[in-house]
Amino acid sequence: MVISPSEVVSVRRRRVSRVATISMHTSPLDQPGTGDAGGMNVYIVEAARRLAQLGVEVEIFTRQTSRDLPPVAEIAPGVSVRHVTAGPYEELDKGDLPGQLCGFLSGVLRTEAMYEPGRYDVIHSHYWLSGQVGWLAKERWGVPLVHTMHTMAKVKNLLLAEDDRPEPTARVLGEEQVVQVADRLVANTPTEAQELIDLYGAAPGRVEVVNPGVNLNVFQPASKGAARHRLDLPQDAHVLLFVGRVQPLKAPDVLLRAAARMLIDDPSLRSRLVVVCVGGPSGNGLARPSYLTDVAASLGISDVVRIVPPAPQHELADWYRAADVTVVPSHNESFGLVALESQACGTPVAAASVGGLRTAVADGVSGVLVEGHDPQDWARVLSRFVHRPAWRDALAAGAVAQAAAFGWSATAARLADVYAGAMANLHHVPIAVSS
């Protein structure tokens, strides 16, 4: 039987109706910047909302961490979160979660069994633990598995911070398994795509690049003065901002050490310099909850450092607007949503020249990419943001333009195409592009 292009498009559109998204280790309802919640949480929620607007329903499976959580919570039309009982009703370290995989998988399979066969057209798993669950669900349901790594053990182990622990062998092996069985692997950037191919042996034809996005309705330029007033920041301050989880990978100490160097080089800055760190301890940083406070004290700069707990998006946007520069000194980032959010608010970025940050930040146009993590080098770059306001303003204009190219609607449209391609390949239907 010969299938016409119009029939192929019809098959694709009819079949892409509902996605089972698996996010075992962290709930999309958690506040980013706390525990294991970060850019991945933002990605899952924002992409799901936009997919639903395209007519693709999304059900997100995550581990239940409290008895008070409902079995199902609708977070937007067409988007629901299913809380699956697996282990104790509490937060668990990621190192303890492999022991709960069987219980979590059982809950996911029981949910699907409540409905008529064919409820889910595709599985999209996030992070390697979820990929293990997705692998087995894929075999049971006969649907394609799309997987996004978000971070990769082999990459992290190549770029370890001085105080960080290497990722365990079990994770490396688990990631290798997921790479081999997934029908499609979604990479945030071409760099990540190449890492999947070079380090994990992924088949190039199964790797798709889909850039994450930014909520341009929330993160947009507004008055810096008004933002500083709301946040009780001096109008004439030089504000250096860090946003993210406090852990060795994110390297917030690099900002503090650079600030200390700036004050040594120019003591007159002390009366106006403000270093703001928005976020909470996470991962390996949980063992040292007072780490940033201790580092600031040891450097003698406690008087210029403000530690702020994780903030909801509308408040976070104000922090970006209030800053002169957002500093992202991570040892690695698969993309770097913080950099994109800051630029969308009109604040340029000083970021480490690693991973996805090379895609998120246009060097010399929307910010500056810094090689290495030497505080002296970072101090020189940050001093330019303080002492060259005209240059900083030019970067701010470039930052807004850079972020405008990364909307979540475009991300969702690309994901829908990836899902369609995976399903067409599974059912041996040739892919046609509608005009």
UniProtKB/Swiss-Prot annotation:
Enzyme class per UniProt: transferase
Residues annotated as binding Mg(2+): Y320, R321, A323, T347
Pfam families, sorted: Glyco_trans_4_4, Glycos_transf_1
Catalytic activity: 1D-myo-inositol 3-phosphate + UDP-N-acetyl-alpha-D-glucosamine = 1D-myo-inositol 2-acetamido-2-deoxy-alpha-D-glucopyranoside 3-phosphate + UDP + H(+)
Listed EC numbers: 2.4.1.250
Gene Ontology biological process terms, A to Z: mycothiol biosynthetic process
Annotated positions binding 1D-myo-inositol 3-phosphate: H25, D36, A37, G38, G39, M40, N41, K94, Y127, T151, R171
Signal peptide (residue range): none
Claim: Transferase is one of the keywords in the record: yes
Residues engaged in binding UDP-N-acetyl-alpha-D-glucosamine: Q31, P32, G39, R245, K250, E333, E341
Keywords: Glycosyltransferase, Magnesium, Metal-binding, Transferase
GO MF terms held by the record: acetylglucosaminyltransferase activity; D-inositol-3-phosphate glycosyltransferase activity; magnesium ion binding
Role according to the record: Catalyzes the transfer of a N-acetyl-glucosamine moiety to 1D-myo-inositol 3-phosphate to produce 1D-myo-inositol 2-acetamido-2-deoxy-glucopyranoside 3-phosphate in the mycothiol biosynthesis pathway.
NCBIfam families xref list: mycothiol_MshA (TIGR03449)
Subunit structure: Homodimer.
Family: Belongs to the glycosyltransferase group 1 family. MshA subfamily.
Protein name: D-inositol 3-phosphate glycosyltransferase
UniProt organism field: Streptosporangium roseum (strain ATCC 12428 / DSM 43021 / JCM 3005 / KCTC 9067 / NCIMB 10171 / NRRL 2505 / NI 9100)
